[in-house]
Amino acid sequence: MNDTPHVKLHGFNNLTKSLSFNMYDICYTKTPKEREAYISYIDDVYNAERLTNILKHVADIIGAHVLNIAKQDYVPQGASVTMLVSEGPVVEVPQAEAPLPEAVVLSLDKSHITVHTYPEYHPSDGISTFRADIDVVTCGEISPLKALDYLIQSFEADIMIIDYRVRGFTRDIHGYKLFIDHDITSIQNYIPEDIREKYDMIDVNIYQENIFHTKCKLRQFDLDNYLFGHTKDALSKQEVEETTAKLKREMDEIFYGKNMPSGF
């Protein structure tokens, strides 16, 4: 996506690039038993071990070296993984009482990949949702956008909210500041066409601040894909209409970020 010729830099590339990927899975559970089964299913499918494997693959895609991994499954539900990464290969630092070199500390502090999961449900409406928040923060030439396609395909979300920003600056050999080192007009530039065709998308970008924001909502709606433990054949015509309305309203509220009146 970047045809800009390489600029010779003075020293290390100090740009910090942050990709925030929030995905939502929505489901209708008819009974409390189905709801508990859905949450248990989500907890099993997106446990800390599987999330760790996803993040390891993200690190491979962006060319980062894993320094440390911390992971945890929570009770009653949810999981999180934090991975520290570096742009260069891992170098063994000799044991010494003196503080570590500053460059090593910066490498550890500023490049990381995290994921947290949040299953939840409506107290009485039958709607259950699952949210996963993934943050990929890199310092240097590594671009987290390279992993976006893989993340989208890993979660197959009903709704995605994606943010990307670039902070700091680096200098060329003449001292001229560079506040971004690649071409981008929209996060959609980095989403393959076959995926873009599946989603309705809205962009809110602030170009002068290097802030890019894209919301995505699945276009095709098949009720059977949102029912857990049964199919629409088990529902009456009225139940199909009411359940469809509930699910679409839930998706619209998440997509637009606001509560909506019944019948919207």
From Swiss-Prot:
Record GO terms (molecular function): adenosylmethionine decarboxylase activity
As to how many cofactors bind and how, the note says: Binds 1 pyruvoyl group covalently per subunit.
Reactions this protein catalyses:
S-adenosyl-L-methionine + H(+) = S-adenosyl 3-(methylsulfanyl)propylamine + CO2
Q: Give me the Gene Ontology terms describing cellular component.
A: cytosol
Q: Where is this site: Cleavage (non-hydrolytic)?
A: 110-111
Report the enzyme's class at the first EC level. Answer: lyase
Q: Could you name the active-site residues? A: 111 (schiff-base intermediate with substrate), 116 (proton acceptor), 139 (proton donor)
Q: Which GO terms describe its biological process?
A: spermidine biosynthetic process
What InterPro entries does the entry give?
AdoMetDC_fam_prok, S-AdoMet_deCO2ase_bac, S-AdoMet_deCO2ase_core
Pathway it works in: Amine and polyamine biosynthesis; S-adenosylmethioninamine biosynthesis; S-adenosylmethioninamine from S-adenosyl-L-methionine: step 1/1
Q: What is its EC number?
A: 4.1.1.50
How this chain assembles, per its entry, is:
Heterooctamer of four alpha and four beta chains arranged as a tetramer of alpha/beta heterodimers.
Q: What does this protein do?
A: Catalyzes the decarboxylation of S-adenosylmethionine to S-adenosylmethioninamine (dcAdoMet), the propylamine donor required for the synthesis of the polyamines spermine and spermidine from the diamine putrescine.
Tell me the protein's name. S-adenosylmethionine decarboxylase proenzyme
Query: Which organism is this entry from?
Result: Geobacillus thermodenitrificans (strain NG80-2)
